[in-house]
Amino acid sequence: MNKPDLTVSDYLKWVNESHYVEGLFEKDTMYQDHVYFRGQASVSWELLPSLFRDSERIHDENMMLEMANNMLWTELNDCRSDLEKMIRLQHYGLHTRLLDITYNPLVALFFACQTPSKPDDDKDGVVYCGYKEGANTKTSYTIAEYVFNHNVFDINQTAFENICKKNNVTQEDCGTIHLITPPLNNPRISAQNGAFIMSPLIKKDVDSHFYIATQADIKKELKTAFMKRYIIPENSKSSIIEELDYLGFNKATIFVDITQKLQYINEKEDKKTMWKIDLNG
């Protein structure tokens, strides 16, 4: 006997339970603002920023950002910092050390219900839920800007220590992940109630004097940053997508580009046509 499809209501029950498990959450506390979610179309995908999914790509970050900045300088001209540029480039599709998250569990559910890009990927989706204890997003954003703007591959230990001291940043700050709530001047981030987890710098040959993470450190820390997960079976995805559409979560509202909005219109019209064929059949 087949299990009944999961519903949005089932999922929201899990979300509510995840807020108050293991004594981490108290009802009506400010800490709920720091609960975040990430939806992935395949449960088999690693929980890693795109830059770190290929070990050979990690040390090309500066070159990739410089090339993108040169090619797209008009599109990036209104960004107030290099970190804002990286955030925008992330949404354009550049591989970065940023991991997209959202404060809206229904947005995460929408992404978890998409179809994986590769045919061999596991078709079940997943939503991860995490919590940043005592997160000060303003401070984290400031630290993240500092970490982004200083490439420790190009400086020695003394210079690195001096830069940290001058900017009131510790070396430990440079070796941990940071929760970033960016300025909502990007319509797509605003539409998705989006934020990011920024992974730290990686030093290829780790010097004991530098507190810079290894790739293994980042994988481990990201796993601990998401304490719960909810599997979305493949056979429930289409019905959940329909429920989300009824609730106002669809391609036209979550994405701001015209292509996605027009694709949504086409898909709605295709469904109407199929429905008419079924009635007449």
Identify the residue ranges that each predicted region occupies.
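Catalytic-core elements of nucleic-acid end-processing and repair enzymes
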Residues: M1-G281
